[in-house]
Regions:
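Gram-negative bacterial Sec-dependent N-terminal signal peptides
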Residues: 1-19
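Short glycine/proline-enriched turn or capping motifs at secondary-structure junctions
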Residues: 3, 755-758
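Glycoside hydrolase catalytic-domain context in secreted enzymes
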Residues: 20-734, 740-754, 763-765
Length: 765
C-alpha cells in the first residue's frame, strides 16, 4: 500500500494479515479484475454488511462522530459526506481499518459544484464563458483541491436543463440549452475525473439530478414534472447521457416525480433507461432523504414499503436516512427484496470503490499524516490566478450606452449597493469549503484596481430587502443576511450624497447568495424593491450609472435597463470575483461572456427560451396581426436573448457560405462565416451556429445551438469560422421514439447571439 505508514492501517493489517492481504494490493484497474474481486468479496459479506455499504450518512448533529464510530465498527456505513478535512477523514478511515471486520474502505463525498476551497463562478456564470478550457480549469482545480482534502467524490456536475428562472437551482446548472449543458457537463466530468478517479488528484463525479429536475412545474422546488417522451429525450435527457458517456461513476436521483412516478421509485428510469439502454455501470444515489419522501409522494404505504420500492427501482445508496439499514434486513428475510437485488446494489457500490482505487490504498487521497496542512484554510492552498481568469470570462456586458465603460482609474467613483462589500455573497451558493473572508468583494476589487489614482466613496445604500418575511426565510438557520437598522431613506440619502460627489456611480445590486439556492424559488424575479428605490434615486442625480448585477438567475430588468447607462452581469463570481469584475470595469479585460439563459421582461413571460416550437400563428413584429401567439401588454421576445453579450469592441459577421447545397446521410456540410473586429480594441466573441429542421414529421424548434467557437481578434483583424455539420447534428426523437434524421431542408444560422444571425440552408438527401 502506498501510505502504509498510517498507524491505523498498520495495526489492523497486523491483526488480520490474511484478510488484508486478500483485500488490499496492487489491483489492476480494469473491469475484468474489478468484477472478479467484487464477486469474491461479496461471498465474504454478511447481509448486514452488504446493507451497510448502501448507507451514505452525513456528519452532523444527527450523526456525531461517536455514533459514526459505532456504525463503522458494525459495518453499517458505506460512505460519508459533509466532512472536508484530512484529519476527520483520516480518523474515520482509520476506524474502518482498526474496528470493522472486513475493512471495506469508506468513500467521502461533498458538493464540489464550482470549486472546493477556491470558489469559481457559479455554473451559470461558467456557462457564460462559452469556453471549454475554462470548464477544464474549474474541473481540474476543483478536483485537485477536493482530493487534497481527502475527498473521493463530488455531487456534481448538475446538468438539469432549466428554462424557468423562478427555480432557485437555476444557478447551479448551465442554463436553458440542451447542447451547451451537454458539452459543459461532459467536459466537467472528464476534467474532474481525469484519466481515472483513482488518480491522486482526481475525484469521481455524480451527474445530477436524474431526471428533468430543472423542469419542475412553476419553477417551484421539488415539484412535479410532466412532459412527453419526445420532449424529455430531445431536450432534457441528453446532458445526463453526455455526462455518463464521459465516464461519470455515479448518478444522483432527482427528488421530483416524472410523469406521475417519483424518480426514486421509477424502475423505468433507473433500470430500463439508465442501466439497460444506456449501459450505466456505476452507482445511483438517492437525493437527501428521498426514500422516506416516497410516503408523502403517495407511492409507498410506510417506511418498509418505501425501501422495497426504492431498492427494486434501482436506488443503490440511500443518502441521509436510516431506512435501508432499518428495514432491508426484514425485507430480505421475508423475500420481498431478493438477495440478488441486494447483491446488485452492493456490487455497484463496491465497483466504484474499486474504481476509486480504495482497495489499492484506502488513503490514496490523503497521503501520509505528516503531510496534512497545519491550516486547512491556508492562503497557499488557493488558486487565485485561475479563479480570476475564469471569473473575468463569466462576465456579460448587457448594456453600454455611449461607451460608459470602461471606466477611468481617476477622478471620484461612488461604489454603492448592499452587495458591493459582501464577501459571503460574491461566492454564491454551494460554495463548498470556501471561506468568505478570503473572497474579494467588488469594492475591494475596485480599490485594488485604482490604487491612489482615484477617490472611492462607499455607501451601502439599501438592504438586500426590507421584506421581513423574506429576511426571516433567508435567516432561518443562520444570519445569512445582515439588516442595517437605519431607515431606508437614510441609507438612500447617504448613497445619493456619495453619488453627487462622484464622476460615476457603480451600484452593485441583485440577490443574496441564499436567494439563488436550493429551496429558494421566487414568484417575483425583479431586483428587490429596496434596491430598486436606490437605483431610482441614483438615476435622479444625473451621474453616469453602472449597474453590477450579482445574482443566480435571470432577473426581470426592464426598468433597470432604461435607467442604467451600463450593465454588467457578473453572477456570483467567486473568490476572486471583485478583482475580476474590476478588471472588466476598467478595461483591463474586454468582456466576452454570453448569456446561457434568456432574460424575460417579466415573470409573466416564463417560460421564455430561444429554442421554442413555432405555432400555426407565429408573431411577426413587421406584420402586426391581432390573432398571433403573443402577449398584447408586453413585447414578445426576451429582454436579453440566449447567447447575448456585448464587448468594448464591435464585430461583423459575413453571410453564411456552405460547402454544398446538399448533404448525404454519410457525408458532411461545412458552414462558414468571416468575422471581423470593426472596433478599436482587441476583443473576443463567441460565434454561435444554430440549425433548424424546416419540415419534419413533428414540429421542431425554430433553432437549436449545435456549435460555437470563441475567437479573439485584434482591431481590423478577420477570421473565418467554420462548423462541420454531420448527420448526428440533425437527429431527433420522433413520434415513434426513433432517433433519426429526416430528409429535407435545414436552415443554418450563424451569429454573435441567438437573435442576430446570418442564414443559409442545405438539403439532407
Amino acid at each position: 500500500m502506498k501510505w502504509l505508514c498510517s498507524v491505523g492501517v498498520a495495526v489492523s493489517l497486523a491483526m488480520q494479515p490474511a484478510l488484508a492481504e486478500n483485500l488490499f494490493g496492487n489491483h489492476p484497474l480494469t473491469p475484468e479484475a474489478r468484477d472478479a474481486f467484487v464477486t469474491d468479496l461479496l461471498k465474504k459479506m454478511t447481509v448486514d454488511e452488504k446493507i451497510g455499504q448502501l448507507r451514505l450518512i452525513s456528519v452532523g448533529p444527527d450523526n456525531p462522530k461517536e455514533a459514526i464510530r459505532e456504525m463503522i465498527k458494525d459495518g453499517q456505513v458505506g460512505a460519508i459526506f459533509n466532512t472536508v478535512t484530512r484529519q476527520d477523514i483520516r480518523q474515520m478511515q482509520d476506524q474502518v481499518m482498526a474496528l470493522s471486520r472486513l475493512k471495506i474502505p469508506l468513500f467521502f463525498a461533498y458538493d464540489v459544484v464550482h470549486g472546493q476551497r477556491t470558489v469559481f463562478p457559479i455554473s451559470l456564470g461558467l456557462a457564460s464563458s462559452f469556453n471549454l478550457d475554462a470548464v477544464r480549469t474549474v474541473g481540474r482545480v476543483s478536483a485537485y483541491e477536493a482530493a487534497d482534502d481527502g475527498l473521493n467524490m463530488t455531487w456534481a456536475p448538475m446538468v438539469d436543463v432549466s428554462r424557468d428562472p423562478r427555480w432557485g437551482r437555476a444557478s447551479e446548472g448551465f442554463g436553458e440549452d440542451t447542447y451547451l449543458t451537454s458539452i459543459m457537463g461532459e467536459t466537467m466530468v472528464k476534467a474532474m475525473q481525469g484519466k481515472s478517479p483513482a488518480d491522486r488528484y482526481s475525484v469521481m463525479t455524480s451527474v445530477k439530478h436524474f431526471a428533468a429536475y430543472g423542469a419542475v412545474e412553476g419553477g417551484k422546488e421539488y415539484n412535479t414534472v410532466d412532459m412527453s417522451s419526445q420532449r424529455l429525450f430531445n431536450d432534457y435527457m441528453p446532458p445526463y447521457k453526455a455526462g455518463l458517456d464521459a465516464g461519470s461513476g455515479a448518478v444522483m436521483v432527482a427528488l421530483n416525480s416524472l410523469n406521475g412516478t417519483p424518480a426514486t421509485s421509477d424502475s423505468w428510469l433507473l433500470k430500463d433507461v439508465l442501466r439497460d439502454e444506456w449501459g450505466f455501470k456505476g452507482i445511483t444515489v438517492s437525493d437527501h432523504g428521498a426514500i422516506k419522501e416516497l410516503i408523502k409522494h403517495g407511492t409507498a404505504a410506510d417506511p418498509e414499503d418505501a425501501v422495497r420500492v426504492a431498492l427494486k427501482a434501482g436506488v443503490d445508496m440511500s443518502m441521509a436516512d436510516e431506512y435501508y439499514s432499518k428495514y432491508l434486513p426484514g425485507l430480505i428475510k421475508s423475500g420481498k427484496v431478493t438477495m440478488a437485488e441486494l447483491d446488485d446494489a452492493t456490487r455497484h457500490v463496491l465497483n466504484v470503490k474499486y474504481d476509486m482505487g480504495l482497495f489499492n490504498d484506502p488513503y490514496s487521497h490523503l497521503g501520509p499524516k505528516e503531510s496534512d496542512p497545519a491550516d486547512t484554510n491556508a492562503e497557499s492552498r488557493l488558486h487565485r490566478k485561475e479563479a480570476r481568469e475564469v471569473a473575468r470570462e463569466s462576465v456579460v456586458l448587457l448594456k453600454n450606452r455611449l461607451e460608459t465603460l470602461p471606466l477611468k482609474k481617476s477622478g471620484t467613483i461612488a461604489v454603492v449597493g448592499p452587495l458591493a462589500d459582501s464577501q459571503r455573497d460574491v461566492m454564491g451558493s454551494w460554495s463548498a469549503a470556501g471561506v468568505a473572508n478570503q473572497s474579494v468583494t467588488v469594492l475591494a476589487g475596485i480599490q485594488n484596481a485604482v490604487g491612489d489614482g482615484a477617490k472611492i466613496l462607499y455607501a451601502k445604500g439599501a438592504n438586500i430587502t426590507n421584506d421581513k418575511g423574506i429576511v426571516d426565510f433567508l435567516n432561518l438557520y443562520e444570519e445569512a443576511v445582515k439588516i442595517d437598522p437605519r431607515s431606508p431613506q437614510a441609507m438612500i440619502d447617504e448613497a445619493v450624497q456619495a453619488a453627487k460627489q462622484a464622476d460615476v456611480v457603480v451600484a452593485v445590486v441583485g440577490e443574496s447568495q441564499g436567494m439563488a439556492h436550493e429551496a429558494s424559488s421566487r414568484t417575483n424575479i425583479t431586483i428587490p424593491q429596496s434596491q430598486r428605490d436606490l437605483i431610482t434615486a441614483l438615476k435622479a442625480t444625473g451621474k453616469p450609472l453602472v449597474l453590477v448585477l450579482m445574482n443566480g438567475r435571470p432577473l426581470a430588468l426592464v426598468k433597470e435597463d432604461q435607467q442604467a447607462d451600463a450593465i454588467l452581469e457578473t453572477w456570483f463570481a467567486g473568490t476572486e470575483g471583485g478583482n475580476a469584475i474590476a478588471d472588466v470595469l476598467f478595461g483591463d479585460y474586454n468582456p466576452s461572456g454570453k448569456l446561457p439563459i434568456s432574460f424575460p421582461r417579466s415573470v409573466g413571460q416564463i417560460p421564455v427560451y430561444y429554442s421554442h416550437l413555432n405555432t400555426g400563428r407565429p408573431y411577426n413584429p413587421e406584420k402586426p396581426n391581432k390573432y398571433t401567439s403573443r402577449y398584447f401588454d408586453e413585447a414578445n421576445g426576451p429582454l436579453y436573448p440566449f447567447g447575448y453579450g456585448l464587448s468594448y469592441t464591435t464585430f461583423t459577421v459575413s453571410d453564411v457560405t456552405l460547402s454544398s447545397p446538399t448533404m448525404q446521410r454519410d457525408g458532411k456540410v461545412t458552414a462558414s462565416v468571416k468575422v471581423t473586429n470593426t472596433g478599436k480594441r482587441e476583443g473576443a466573441t463567441v460565434i454561435q451556429m444554430y440549425l433548424q429542421d424546416v419540415t419534419a414529421s413533428m414540429s421542431r424548434p425554430v433553432k437549436q445551438l449545435k456549435g460555437f467557437e470563441k475567437i479573439t481578434l485584434k482591431p481590423g483583424e478577420s477570421k473565418t469560422v467554420s462548423f462541420p455539420i454531420d448527420i448526428e447534428a440533425l437527429k431527433f426523437w420522433n413520434q415513434q421514439m426513433k432517433y433519426d434524421a429526416e430528409p429535407g431542408k435545414f436552415n443554418v444560422f450563424i451569429g454573435v447571439d441567438s437573435a442576430r444571425v446570418k442564414q443559409g440552408s442545405f438539403e439532407l438527401l
